[in-house]
Amino acid sequence: MIAYEKLQQELRRSPRKWLVTGAAGFIGSHLVETLLQLNQKVVGLDNFSTGTPENLEDLQSSLSIKQRRQFRFIEGDITSETDCKRACRGVDYVLHQAALGSVPRSFADPLSTHLANTTGFLQILLAAQKAKVKRVVYASSSSVYGNEKKLPQKEEKTGALLS
């Protein structure tokens, strides 16, 4: 049995409560869907700055009524201490996907990018700490590996950094 199958069995056996930030984004919405299909409780937090309501609507069709009831969505912002505290309440694990992820955008609007990607991340960490969350998983960007063409990219070999 592969590790992913073991993890799926463990999650089904012992459900947990998860917070997915950036829940309306491409990756976030797929994480929400997968967790709900594994009968987990999920809180989604998103401000729709880059994610879309359609991503959340699309996942509904693959879920049972019971699974849909296990999802609570908060339209809020990771830069808001109040929103982060509310989202982290009662959560076991945080999957932090929320970010403004475009290198060109970061040059065009460095303050908004910094606020979301740095201050927002810190707000999530502080709220998670106060809520006694067991673990926060942070999603980085493949841009940190630079423009290396060979896949898979490896940490020890980088091209010209993109961010």
Predicted features, each with a name:
Residues 1-163:
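N-terminal Rossmann-like NAD(P)+-binding domain of SDR-like oxidoreductases, especially those catalyzing
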